[in-house]
């Protein structure tokens, strides 16, 4: 590195010595935790261990340049950085290994994630944003390789937006856009598509991202030569290198064991990103992995003796220690004193954490033993109870699972009889207290989880009939005027106002920062949205067609959908995804993969408006709450006429509430989205045969029918028909499961439910292709007629085809 890239920070020698010794203390503490943590897992006290050994030095250097307001989007090697910032104590480190779920104990995920997955709270216990501009922030880690990349783009771009826009309350989230997103990733994960897509987008957008690539030459057992062209990711990225004439990405390569070189590299990287908003990749080479990849296996299996000897010599902590001694900054005895003190502290923290983990479980064991002793009296020393007491007394290294297995196994042997009433109550109470620890916060649970007041849509006298897309456009106009922190971006969103003109002219009115075009890169469009939402903005990320959501499904599923759950409600990303879908033309422009989305995206609302007025109401509602959601507009409905509301931007709806569109007494027809128009047409035809069908618009698949309209309808019709243009068993299967298990509709049915869906293959092209691939009015009408034929075959003769 040249002198022009050196840090401008000035310290006197004593301050410098103190800082170096603090750094060594941090590095040694982190390693001591890793060593003892691995031992605890191998002893069976934890299920899995993955640690940051070998990455301590670059992380403690990053810590010097990580400022309040900054964000990290990293992975399961970043423990040293969290320790250096005071977010991860030695005790908390072991709480994670032991998966302690006691409230308020394990700070990262409340015991839901394996150790090594870190985060800091972004909201308080009431759901209000913390002052993020004054805090050092860490977005929640996740295990899938490179899954942390897409959101880096949005976290970094948020700084650019806060710098360009003067937003009310902007100081709560940003210091004039001076924040860096610090990204971290392992070398092998750079082979993933998310990595390259993010680097490309960062270079295009010019955002303050500093991405560290920790390169230890391996991806578990696979060497770099089998992972990356030329065996070096920085060589592969040379085409992205910025020049004096062209914007791009600054690429720095530095050895991970060289303390002074790391300081120079990160000083330069931080200054470039923070002041000029230029993305920087820091390729940290010659990293080692002293403990191997994880507790799942030993790296001695695949590394040569020569490689292992080199790793031992170039362990960054050892090199750092040797450098300190060579520079005369500390003596051997001084460093040994630091090491001995840390080893003692870490051992004590481990012991304390283990005792804290076991205490409530031991208490539950004593309670169960007392219950069993009462049960043995009630059953006259029944041998099954005696055996259960013996097994319970001999338990060693157990959790709640083993206690419940003993208790539940015993009560089943008595056919859940009265002898076990007290024991069954104990089981019930324990499950009730424990279930929320493992199953809460899939969705937002604070006062921002639902709109406060429902406002009906209103119309002026003689309100005009307009294309549906005009209703949507003018409603977006009202929303952008009301919400200065609202942004929308996606393919063709800006200049032409989206492919269906729902944003026509709005870029000219509100600017290219708020109404923005993007490249064809669905995964990072979602990543932009997640990152912006984490930083307090209100983004709408547009995926041009529903079929293209599949490009981003991994990011949506693993990151956005699980965010509230995996942080126990401490982080939220109220991203709105706008897309359009269902029937149009061709295999990839008329898909409706709702079943896949419903299974993969629990944690995200999935809203399915039948027209553009309903879509507008959904956007209006979503901006009043803090729940991520996908709104699927009806692709073939933009040119259909709708009445123009006169309270644009204000009317809303209870999300998840279904609506009865047509009353009837003979059967209940349930559907959503574009298909509803066909269902209504079929219901009209049925009426001509004196069959009165009740038509219900679900409006939302997640949440589903929160007002129980379907059960109320079935109480009078006793027949259920679900019409869906997904594949057989797709959304229709999900809807039926929800109704049978959650709403207990089975006793209301006099006939078997009828599911009408699309064919199992992709929809064929053309009008005839649509007719034979998706449910038609004829299909729906005939399926309903057949239900009535079963009831009254004399009045409704059988269809002969």
Predicted regions and their residues:
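Non-catalytic terminal/interface segments that mediate subunit docking, oligomerization
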Residues: 382-528, 533-535, 547
């Amino acid at each position: 590195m040249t002198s022009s890239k050196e840090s401008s920070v000035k310290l006197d020698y004593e301050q410098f010595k103190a800082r170096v010794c603090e750094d060594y203390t941090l590095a040694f503490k982190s390693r001591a935790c890793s060593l003892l943590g691995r031992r605890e897992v191998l002893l069976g006290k934890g299920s899995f261990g993955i640690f940051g050994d070998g990455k301590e030095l670059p992380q403690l250097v990053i810590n010097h340049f990580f400022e309040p307001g900054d964000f990290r989007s990293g992975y399961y090697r970043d423990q040293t950085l969290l320790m250096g910032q005071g977010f991860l104590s030695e005790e908390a480190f072991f709480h994670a290994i032991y998966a302690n779920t006691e409230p308020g104990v394990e700070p990262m995920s409340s015991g839901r994630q394996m150790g090594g997955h870190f985060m800091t709270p972004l909201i308080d216990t009431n759901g209000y944003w913390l002052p993020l501009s004054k805090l050092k922030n860490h977005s929640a880690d996740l295990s899938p390789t490179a899954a942390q990349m897409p959101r880096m783009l949005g976290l970094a771009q948020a700084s650019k937006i806060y710098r360009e826009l003067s937003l009310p309350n902007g100081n709560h989230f940003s210091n004039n856009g001076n924040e860096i997103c610090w990204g971290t990733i392992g070398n092998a994960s750079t082979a993933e598509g998310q990595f390259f897509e993010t680097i490309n987008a960062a270079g295009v957008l010019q955002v303050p991202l500093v991405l560290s690539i920790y390169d230890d030459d391996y991806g578990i057992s696979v060497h770099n030569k089998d992972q990356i062209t030329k065996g070096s990711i920085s060589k592969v990225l040379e085409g992205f290198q910025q020049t004096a004439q062209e914007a791009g990405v600054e690429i720095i390569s530095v050895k991970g064991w060289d303390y002074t070189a790391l300081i120079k590299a990160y000083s330069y990287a931080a200054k470039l990103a923070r002041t000029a908003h230029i993305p920087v990749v820091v390729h940290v080479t010659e990293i080692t992995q002293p403990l191997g990849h994880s507790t799942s296996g030993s790296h001695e299996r695949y590394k040569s003796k020569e490689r292992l000897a080199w790793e031992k010599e170039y362990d960054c902590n050892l090199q750092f220690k040797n450098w300190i001694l060579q520079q005369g900054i500390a003596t051997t005895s001084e460093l040994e004193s630091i090491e001995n003190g840390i080893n003692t502290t870490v051992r004590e923290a481990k012991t304390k954490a283990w005792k804290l983990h076991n205490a409530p479980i031991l208490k539950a064991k004593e309670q169960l033993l007392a219950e069993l002793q009462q049960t043995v009296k009630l059953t006259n020393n029944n041998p099954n109870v005696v055996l259960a007491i013996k097994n319970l007394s001999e338990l060693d290294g157990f959790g709640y699972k083993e206690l419940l297995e003993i208790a539940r196994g015993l009560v089943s042997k008595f056919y859940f009889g009265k002898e076990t009433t007290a024991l069954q109550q104990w089981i019930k109470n324990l499950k009730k207290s424990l279930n929320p620890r493992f199953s809460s916060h899939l969705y937002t649970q604070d006062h921002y989880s639902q709109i406060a007041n429902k406002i009906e849509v209103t119309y002026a006298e003689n309100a005009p009939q307009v294309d549906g897309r005009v209703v949507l456009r003018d409603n977006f106009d009202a929303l952008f005027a009301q919400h200065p922190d609202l942004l929308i971006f996606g393919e063709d969103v800006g200049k032409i106002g989206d492919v269906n003109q729902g944003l026509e002219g709005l870029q000219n009115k509100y600017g290219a920062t708020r109404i923005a075009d993007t490249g064809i890169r669905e995964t990072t469009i979602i990543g932009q949205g997640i990152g912006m939402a984490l930083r307090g903005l209100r983004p709408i990320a547009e995926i041009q067609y529903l079929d293209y959501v599949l490009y981003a499904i991994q990011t949506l599923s693993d990151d956005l959908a699980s965010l509230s759950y995996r942080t126990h409600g401490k982080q939220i990303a109220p991203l709105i995804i706008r897309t359009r879908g269902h029937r149009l033309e061709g295999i990839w422009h008329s898909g409706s993969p709702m079943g896949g989305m419903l299974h993969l995206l629990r944690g995200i609302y999935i809203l399915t408006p039948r027209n553009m007025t309903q879509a507008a109401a959904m956007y209006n509602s979503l901006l009043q709450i803090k729940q991520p959601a996908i709104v699927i507009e009806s692709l073939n409905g933009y040119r259909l006429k709708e009445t123009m509301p006169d309270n644009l931007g204000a009317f809303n709806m209870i999300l998840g509430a279904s609506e009865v569109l047509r009353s009837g007494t003979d059967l209940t027809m349930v559907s959503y989205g574009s298909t509803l128009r066909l269902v209504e047409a079929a219901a009209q035809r049925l009426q001509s045969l004196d069959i009165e069908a009740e038509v219900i618009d679900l409006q939302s698949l997640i949440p589903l029918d929160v007002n129980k309209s379907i059960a109320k309808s079935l109480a009078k019709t006793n027949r259920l028909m679900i019409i869906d243009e997904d594949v057989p068993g797709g959304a229709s299967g999900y809807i039926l499961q929800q109704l049978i298990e959650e709403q207990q509709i089975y006793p209301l049915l006099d006939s078997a439910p009828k599911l009408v869906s699309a064919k199992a293959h992709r929809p064929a092209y053309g009008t005839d292709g649509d007719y034979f691939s998706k449910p038609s009015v004829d299909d729906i009408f005939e399926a309903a007629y057949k239900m009535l034929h079963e009831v009254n075959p004399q009045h409704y003769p059988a269809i002969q085809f």
